[in-house]
Amino acid sequence: MSPLTALITGASSGIGRSLAHVFAREGYALVLVARRLAVLEELAAELSRDHGVTVRVMAIDLAEPDAAMRLFADLQQSGVVVDVLVNNAGFGMQGAFAALPADRQLQMIHLNVTALTALTRLLLPSMLERGKGGVLNVGSTAGFQPGPFMAVYYATKAYVISFTEALADELSGSGLRVSCLAPGPTATAFATEAGAAESRLFQSDTMSVDEVARIGYEGWRAGKFLVVAGRRNWWRAFAVRILPRSYVRRVVRDLNSRPD
């Protein structure tokens, strides 16, 4: 029997890279998608050597307007059947909304929201025909509340949580597993790239990428629509649902600021 195939976006580093190792250990063939071809090729060789799985790499920037369609066309042309889609690619930016570059904020929306939605819509019908596989979307605990000074990023992750929950409900009984992994602060390059490394949020305790990836995979396998990584993050996610919104905004604003 041929192994199932998992496509992982944003696979070259961070949570995506760790998820690639998790799926490879479970015997999945992989399609790894990210911008940096050399890094992908190095990772593919490592996964093939360590886990004996087939790995295909596709260097593409999903922040580009037509990237999802081009990726889908390449998959069809190559005859690759995707059983599990892991939408992990994304980025954030810290700063006042009116001061951050408009083009980069629109790219963030496209990558975090539009590309994720497009790939899910393009790949889902064939999964439904086979009645197996599923989708694992990587969201964030940022999606549970508004985020002053990371306003667009928090909003995109709110979309991911809402979209995934609705999709999981629609596909109940289909044989597909649909989950949203919601990590909190994690030890990746995300904070540095977002300009948030010195914020109070990322000065607090962070989880390791391997732990987050393991929790995400196990939660998806268990059929949980929402997988909050870590007990502390789970309690935070619960708390913001019952605390006054004005208080939550003040706390998040403080966490997203840099210490004096």
PLM feature segments, named:
Residues 96-98, 104-109:
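Substrate-binding pocket helix/loop in short-chain dehydrogenase/reductase
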Residues 120, 156:
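Active-site helix of classical SDR
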Residues 168-235, 246:
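SDR active-site lid
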Residues 12-13:
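Conserved glycine-rich cofactor-binding loop
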Residues 26-43:
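Conserved glycine-rich Rossmann-like NAD(P)H-binding loop of the short-chain dehydrogenase/reductase
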Residues 88-93:
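Conserved NAD(P)H cofactor-binding loop of Rossmann-fold oxidoreductase domains
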Residues 140:
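Residue(s) in the substrate-gating loop at a strand-loop-helix junction
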